[in-house]
Amino acid sequence: MVPVLHSLSTIILIAEFVWGNLSNGLIVLKNCIDWINKKELSTVDQILIVLAISRISLIWETLIIWVKDQLISSITIEELKIIVFSFILSSHFSLWLATALSIFYLFRIPNCYWQIFLYLKWRIKQLIVHMLLGSLVFLVANMIQITITLEERFYQYGGNTSVNSMETEFSILIELMLFNMTMFSIIPFSLALISFLLLIFSLWKHLQKMPLNSRGDRDPSATAHRNALRILVSFLLLYTIYFLSLLISWVAQKNQSELVHIICMITSLVYPSFHSYILILGNYKLKQTSLWVMRQLGCRMKRQNTPTT
């Protein structure tokens, strides 16, 4: 690849890496401080903490995979297992926790009086816990399949860990990992999509009941609907881009197209980095904290640039 393009892509990757760690780190830090001070934390804040931690892990794992891909000859089988399992773990919880957040918005925002809806609404915490525990079945199945495939291939090579065999193993694992991601992502992605459609329906029903002169920014219910829809749309769109970028990256790697592979790696980091920024903008507490941090940084930079007399 042209050195200029390689340098530019490296700068963008580093910028996304820093941005993702800062935005997710802000979510974790602010909510942990509130947890310590108030001795309690709301359900949505608990979800945000674990979601942010999983995304920090996902950002690091994506970067490690990119670096190790450049140094494939130096990877051992055990290192390959750790990298793949860590990526699967962080990707799994990042997706399912975002889905849990979507379901939380669905049951908390709309004013619906169906019996089944009210029953689940008052048990939303138990519903989310059971959903996340149930998702562990898919996680374990995914890891077992990866382990069996890796052990079979390693046995087939007779313990050979040459460069060619490692490149073959890496390609096979990426292919299997992407296939499993496709299959195991169908349920959480569908749940998030259903939540999005039901929120649109709820907003439409709400606007139908409201008089025309009341349909504005002063309507708290409509504002909450729009905020939740903004978060869900960004999640669905960014996760789709994230998955497609991984798929195209794998194809580019097989065809030895380094430029396309690098572009896809850059694109894949947009999901865990920038969706958290959208979550911050949609959360009043986190938004105010981020503005305070930016003001403090601005004041400090201004003081440093002001010449002393």
From Swiss-Prot:
Organism: Mus musculus (Mouse)
TM stretches of this protein: 8-28, 47-67, 87-107, 128-148, 184-204, 231-251, 262-282
Extracellular side: 1-7, 68-86, 149-183, 252-261
Presence of the UniProt keyword Nuclease in the record: no
Record's miscellaneous remark: Several bitter taste receptors are expressed in a single taste receptor cell.
Residues bearing glycans: N160, N180, N255
Annotated localization: Membrane
Protein name: Taste receptor type 2 member 124
